[in-house]
Amino acid sequence: MIQRQSYLNVADNSGAKKVQMIGIPYALRQYVSVGDVVTVTVKEATPNGAAKKGKVYRAVVVRVAKELKRSDGSYIKFDDNAVILLNQYGESLGTRILGPIAREVRNRGFTKIASLAAEVV
């Protein structure tokens, strides 16, 4: 389960490696799942990347370690919790997506992110 103060991996090549979730915009919920937009701050970053340490970004959750029940009755879970950083227009900050992403991301309207991903599970 992902909640405020959780550390997440970054699944794109924006330059950030680890981020900390600091909020859930427009929601009073405690937990988030795949496809939700969250506010994060960068905790670890590469020196030459677009994302800098300490900056605040919006991000979409693409993988969660907690099992997720689908409408057909099947369950899916991943090895880590991962996000993709978004720019101010809601587009991916990076140009490549690393690792698989859940199908629910495409269903939530992030079709550009789903098309960049090598594998949609």
From Swiss-Prot:
InterPro entries: Ribosomal_uL14, Ribosomal_uL14_bac-type, Ribosomal_uL14_sf. CDD domains: Ribosomal_uL14 (cd00337). Pfam families: Ribosomal_L14. Keywords: Ribonucleoprotein, Ribosomal protein, RNA-binding, rRNA-binding. GO terms for cellular component: cytosolic large ribosomal subunit. Binds to 23S rRNA. Forms part of two intersubunit bridges in the 70S ribosome. Part of the 50S ribosomal subunit. Forms a cluster with proteins L3 and L19. In the 70S ribosome, L14 and L19 interact and together make contacts with the 16S rRNA in bridges B5 and B8. This is Large ribosomal subunit protein uL14. It comes from Hydrogenobaculum sp. (strain Y04AAS1).
